[in-house]
Amino acid sequence: MNVEEEVGKLKEEIQRLGQKQPDGSYKVTFGVIFNDDRCANIFEALVGTLRAAKKRKIVKYDGELLLQGAHDNVEITLLPPPAVAAA
């Protein structure tokens, strides 16, 4: 699986595990994703996938490197897709 595929899977998993917000974003904590069995089977390097998604402005979270235990309560936000301009 390449990085783009992993980021796509990450988006699906955040939608599955997270709470939808009024603005169309989804929020979930790092601990929920990290401790989910399905995510553990999909992502070889969850932190690397999160960093790639953050770099692409698909997700946002505080900090650079998330560590199990220390950052379990850090909120990860899957940003809503950009609005399509009306023609």
Curated annotation (Swiss-Prot):
It comes from the Eukaryota. It holds the Pfam family Costars. GO terms for biological process: regulation of actin filament-based process. Belongs to the costars family. This is Costars family protein. The lineage of its organism: Eukaryota, Viridiplantae, Streptophyta, Embryophyta, Tracheophyta.
